[in-house]
């Protein structure tokens, strides 16, 4: 069973096994959650989602995690464009 360890706005972070789960509580758990290994990175991802910012040093897994969490279409599209740019 997971235990909530942090919440900021609609984002909850749960301790799960050897990592953490971030869930956007405004969306279905199945569609709007992601798994992260460190608590520090989980909090960073929550902060990026709330401020709708792009990571300074983007990598594929981080962008995909942000895309799974957000329910904002404009932010999702910015993340998708960034992800496509990394694939070139």
Segments the model singles out, each with a brief description of its role:
Residues 1-22, 31, 51, 60, ...:
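Short N-terminal "domain-start" leader segments
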Residues 25-41, 49:
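A short, exposed loop/beta-hairpin motif centered on an aromatic-Gly-Thr core
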Residues 44-56:
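Short, surface-exposed secondary-structure junctions/capping segments
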Residues 56-65:
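N-terminal DNA-binding module of tyrosine recombinases/phage integrases
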């Amino acid at each position: 069973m997971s235990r909530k360890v942090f919440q900021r706005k609609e984002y909850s972070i749960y301790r799960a096994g050897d990592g953490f789960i971030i869930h956007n509580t405004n969306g279905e758990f199945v569609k709007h959650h992601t798994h992260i290994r460190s608590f520090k990175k989980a909090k960073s991802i929550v902060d990026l989602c709330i401020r709708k910012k792009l990571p300074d040093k983007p990598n594929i897994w981080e962008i995909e995690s942000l895309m799974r969490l957000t329910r904002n279409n404009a932010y999702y599209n910015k993340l998708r464009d960034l992800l496509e740019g990394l694939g070139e």
